[in-house]
Swiss-Prot record:
Keywords: Metal-binding, Ribonucleoprotein, Ribosomal protein, RNA-binding, rRNA-binding, Zinc. The keyword Ribonucleoprotein applies. One of its GO terms (cellular component) is cytosolic small ribosomal subunit. One of its GO terms (biological process) is cytoplasmic translation. Zn(2+) binds at C15, C18, C33, C36. GO terms for molecular function: rRNA binding; structural constituent of ribosome; zinc ion binding. Disulfide bonds: none annotated. It comes from Methanococcoides burtonii (strain DSM 6242 / NBRC 107633 / OCM 468 / ACE-M). This is Small ribosomal subunit protein uS14. Binds 16S rRNA, required for the assembly of 30S particles.
């Protein structure tokens, strides 16, 4: 079988940092999974209010 590239759907995008496909934060063009986002959100300028 030949491997094909996924062009659309949930598995088409991946985290820029670790490559994970689940739990992706796409808002504002971030494209990080939720785990990586929590680790570097403060460095990116996001603040936790509650």
């Amino acid at each position: 079988m030949t491997q094909t590239v996924k062009n659309f759907g949930r598995g088409a995008n991946e985290c820029k940092r670790c490559g994970r496909k689940q739990g992706l934060v796409r808002k504002y063009g971030i494209y990080l999974c939720r785990h990586c986002f929590r680790e570097i959100a403060h460095d990116m300028g996001f603040e936790k209010y509650s």
